[in-house]
């Protein structure tokens, strides 16, 4: 058998999107894999007809098997780590304005994307061991952004 991953959009509205990303690893650690691509989503409510180019993460719910860690990244030529996720739990970021895509720079309220910026959220894992089968499940609550 080979590693398998699945991505399921649980909710997609004009502002919010909730995605569940799961994986079963029996061959190796997960190499960079797209979790969510904002350009594949529907238009944003506060900018009619405008497709999102970035996402903000407001909440993460996760269940990652012991010894395994799941790393989330903002995609760019040099990916920017969002968070390393281990164990089981829930992180809420809405009270601090969410986790914003910082694969670029902000100046005077204007965002300038880094080289190779795609807006995607990607994932990798660390900790898989030979002859083992490890799994993870993560649910991301996101807000679409231009």
Q: Where on the chain are the PLM-derived regions?
A:
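Noncatalytic modules at the cell exterior or secretory-pathway interfaces
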Residues: 103-135
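An anionic, turn-rich surface loop/hairpin at beta-sheet edges
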Residues: 80-106
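C-terminal interaction-tip segments
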Residues: 1-14, 125-146
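Beta-rich globular "head" domains
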Residues: 37-73
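Hydrophobic beta-strand residues in large extracellular and virion-surface proteins
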Residues: 19, 57, 70-72, 82, ...
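Short, surface-exposed beta-strand/loop "edge" segments at domain boundaries and coil↔beta transitions
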Residues: 25-33, 68-70, 80, 126-137
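Solvent-exposed, flexible loop/coil segments flanking beta-strands in beta-rich domains
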Residues: 1-49
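Short, surface-exposed beta-strand/strand-loop-strand elements in extracellular ectodomains
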Residues: 66-86
